Amino acid sequence: MNGDKKQVTDIVETLKKGPLDPNVEVVIGVPAIYLAYVQSIVPGTISVAAQNCWKVAKGAFTGEISPAMIKDIGANWVILGHSERRTIFGEKDDLVAEKVAHALENGLKVIACIGETLEEREAGKTEEVVFRQTKALLPAIGNNWANVVLAYEPVWAIGTGKTASPQQAQDVHASLRNWLSSNASPDVAASVRIQYGGSVTAANAKELSAFPDID
């Protein structure tokens, strides 16, 4: 819940100046109130994502938005399962999976977020947590992996200034690909994009992206 219309516009203008790598898919996730505005000013090389949506098409869910509404204004992406939705709003794995399933069924592409808390990392439960969260998504995604990006975002590294070291991030991504190979398919493990999110800056982005399993 950050930014305003001017800040969003400034970000878009910066991206427009580019040049953007044609091999990189650029997606901006913006607050719902700015979705239509940003969709109207981005060039065709940049996509727009909602930061959340609900699990049904319509109904008495005041304050929520649906995949159909997101599609209606021309956006094609949604971020689901963000750690703040999980920790602050109490969204559990099964609810995130329901949202992912409905979004995919309605033609949206999904950035599905997973990640452990500091307590879970210090207890040595990082893999247990991210595997559990990903396992919940498998039935929701089915054969739709081409429209899904996984985002590994350790909760303790979001907005705190703390960052998982590039090697720590790589280790989790590699373990996740191995798990996907056994529990989804080797093709999914090799092809799915797994991003890292958590206090990423211009200074550390290049080092993070140099690792083979970090997209």
From Swiss-Prot:
- Which Gene Ontology CC terms are recorded? cytosol
Active-site residues are 82 (electrophile), 153 (proton acceptor)
UniProt cross-references to CDD domains, sorted A to Z = TIM
Identify the pathway.
Carbohydrate biosynthesis; gluconeogenesis; Carbohydrate degradation; glycolysis; D-glyceraldehyde 3-phosphate from glycerone phosphate: step 1/1
The UniProt family comment states: Belongs to the triosephosphate isomerase family.
Q: How does it assemble?
A: Homodimer.
NCBIfam families on file: tim
Q: What is this protein called?
A: Triosephosphate isomerase
The gene designation is: Tpi
